[in-house]
């Protein structure tokens, strides 16, 4: 059975459009309440919901039409961790009692990129390491490894594309970070989050990352396939004034 990417291109563009529409509405409401600034646009909670249809479409089209796709309700989106008791995810996919996929959806819009990038990086690294360790320690029981993903939408603007210098007087910064813009830093972050044994493609796209999700779904559809899917392709998908980077 060939993988079906479920119109990912169109759905990704709709997701970006919905993000900016939702953010603009939040800012307008904020101004009406005279609370000022960027806060509502940043904290508008469900601005990334437009990408849920893309993820759910991949699940439904690749062998698990009756899978439970959890997107709401704190108890439904909570998984145990190894270094902390629990972690709240944005999307969880189950086939019966088996965890098929866990995905985080994030965004980063200016004007501040410096500290916020570090916060996003620390969050992504911690989340990936925590869940991977819990899985190795057997928290999910006897099942195939689930698909795990971290998708971030970054504003494509002058500040995010500007070269940034770092000062590290005691030891040198890794070459791939020297003079790198924040957009490039996100790409480097995603590449380095890839599980050992995979080499990033020279031109990373959203499509190959979603193919990994589809392949994982298909592996659950065929229980006799016991290959350990150690996967992770980063993806960058330029759409209008945004760029989507995905690490799976």
UniProtKB/Swiss-Prot annotation:
Record-linked InterPro entries: Restrct_endonuc_II_XhoI (IPR007636)
Keyword Amino-acid biosynthesis: no
Coiled-coil portions: none
Pfam families assigned to the protein according to its UniProt record, in alphabetical order: XhoI
Signal peptide boundaries: none
Enzyme class: hydrolase
Catalyzed reaction equations: Endonucleolytic cleavage of DNA to give specific double-stranded fragments with terminal 5'-phosphates
Keywords: Endonuclease, Hydrolase, Nuclease, Restriction system
Domain of life according to the entry: Bacteria
E.C. code: 3.1.21.4
Hydrolase found in the keyword field: yes
GO BP terms in the entry: DNA restriction-modification system
GO molecular function: DNA binding; type II site-specific deoxyribonuclease activity
Family named by the database record: Belongs to the XhoI type II restriction endonuclease family.
Protein name per UniProt: Type II restriction enzyme XhoI
Organism: Xanthomonas vasicola
